[in-house]
Amino acid sequence: MKISGAVLLAVVAVTPAAAVDKKATKFAEGLKNLDLETRLEQICDYEAMRRIGRDGKEFRPDRSQSNAVSEPKHEGSMLIANGAAFRSKGQWYRFSFTCKGAPDHLSVVSFAYQIGEQIPEAKWEEYGLWK
């Protein structure tokens, strides 16, 4: 099921701005087909890309994985991801985040993150990352 969710996230992440509203609606509709844990991971990964891209000019995330280095911890509507990774300009970076979703896991209520080090390309395969 996570692969399907990753595909949904990828469609929204690489879409031109003119089509974002339509793709975002399609993304939200697709989320309803996922189990609650996967849905929470998807909305939190999407929020991570949005926030990191918005908060500075250094990064332009096009992918985010809450479970890249280690599995995230689910606590109801809260997702704690200490082993997350995001891709920006062809490079992967470690980061951690805490994300609280709405009860239906279709939107984010609160989100905080911290960016870590760049992940060496030699580690990408080990973490399931790609170019």
How should these model regions be labeled?
Residues 1-8:
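Sec-dependent signal peptide recognition
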Residues 12-17:
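N-terminal signal peptide c-region/cleavage motif recognized by signal peptidases
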